[in-house]
């Protein structure tokens, strides 16, 4: 693997591992799947193919971030809007 791509792949792995800490099925589950995915592609040597895989990994990062933001939004909505609804019903 070429040096610049190697650093990109390592950074991608670290970022995914960090994001996996909050994965709904648990960090251990995510870590095992992540390791398996990277090990499956460890023999890829074509720089274009490696870049394509890195781009796919970055897409996964964006999807995970969206999942986490949605989960936080739902928790906040549940926390605040249910209180507001219950106070409105008590007033009326």
Curated annotation (Swiss-Prot):
Does this UniProt record's set of keywords contain Cytoplasm?
no
The processes (GO biological process) annotated in the record are: negative regulation of oxidative phosphorylation; respiratory electron transport chain
Q: Which InterPro entries does the record match to this protein?
A: Complex1_LYR_dom (IPR008011), Complex1_LYR_ETFRF1_LYRM5 (IPR045296), ETFRF1 (IPR052000)
| Keyword field contains Glycosyltransferase | no
Primary site of residence: mitochondrion
Q: Which locations, inside or outside the cell, does it occupy?
A: Mitochondrion
Tree of life domain: Eukaryota
What is one GO cellular-component annotation here? mitochondrion
- Keywords assigned: Mitochondrion
Q: Which Pfam families match?
A: Complex1_LYR (PF05347)
PANTHER family, per the entry: ELECTRON TRANSFER FLAVOPROTEIN REGULATORY FACTOR 1 (PTHR21024:SF0), GROWTH HORMONE-INDUCIBLE SOLUBLE PROTEIN-RELATED (PTHR21024)
What is the role of this chain?
Acts as a regulator of the electron transfer flavoprotein by promoting the removal of flavin from the ETF holoenzyme (composed of etfa and etfb).
UniProt lists the family membership as follows: Belongs to the complex I LYR family.
Query: What's the protein called, per UniProt?
Result: Electron transfer flavoprotein regulatory factor 1
Q: Which organism is it from?
A: Salmo salar (Atlantic salmon)
Recorded name of the encoding gene:
etfrf1
């Amino acid at each position: 693997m070429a040096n610049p791509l190697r650093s990109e792949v390592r950074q991608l792995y670290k970022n995914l591992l960090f994001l996996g800490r909050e994965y709904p099925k648990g960090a251990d589950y995510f870590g095992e799947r992540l390791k398996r995915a990277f090990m499956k592609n460890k023999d890829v040597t074509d720089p274009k193919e490696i870049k394509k895989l890195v781009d796919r990994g970055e897409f996964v990062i964006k999807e995970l971030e969206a999942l986490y933001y949605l989960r936080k939004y739902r928790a906040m909505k549940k926390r605040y809007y249910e209180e507001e609804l219950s106070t409105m019903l008590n007033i009326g």
